[in-house]
Amino acid sequence: MVSIIYYSMTGNTKKMAMAMAEELGVKALNVKDAASLPNDGILLIGSGCYGDKPGEPMAKFIANNDFGGRKVALFGTSGAGAGNEVAAMAEALKQKGAEVIGNYHSAGRAFVVANIGHPNKDELSAARKFAREMASIG
C-alpha cells in the first residue's frame, strides 16, 4: 500500500499529488490533515519550494514523526528553484530514519506569472509514472 502526503500553497504540488493518487487508486492527504504517520508501506511525500525548503507544515510533519525504516519517495514543485525542497526533505527524512527510494521534481507556477501552466500534461504523466515505479518497489 502507498500513502501520499503533500503540502501545497499554490496548488501545483496538490495537482501532482492528485494525479499520482488517481494513478495508484489511493487518496492524497494534505499534510495539514495528517494527524499522524500512516501505517501503510511506502510513503510518497511532496511539497512546493519556499525559500529552497519545503513548506513549514511539511517540515514540521517530518520533524515530528519517526520514519525509522520506512521507504519514502519524494516529489516537489518549484517556480524558481531546482528541486532544493526535495533535497532538504531527503536530508531531514534520512535523519529521521527513512530510506529515501526516489524523487521527482517539476516546475510550478511562481510569482503568479512564471511557469504558468505547470505542472503540465507531460510533467503530470511523468509524475504518474514515478508513482507507479515507487509503488512497485514496496
Question: What residues fall within each predicted segment?
Answer:
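FMN-binding flavodoxin-like domain, especially the glycine-rich phosphate-binding loop
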Residues: 2-3, 8-33, 37-138
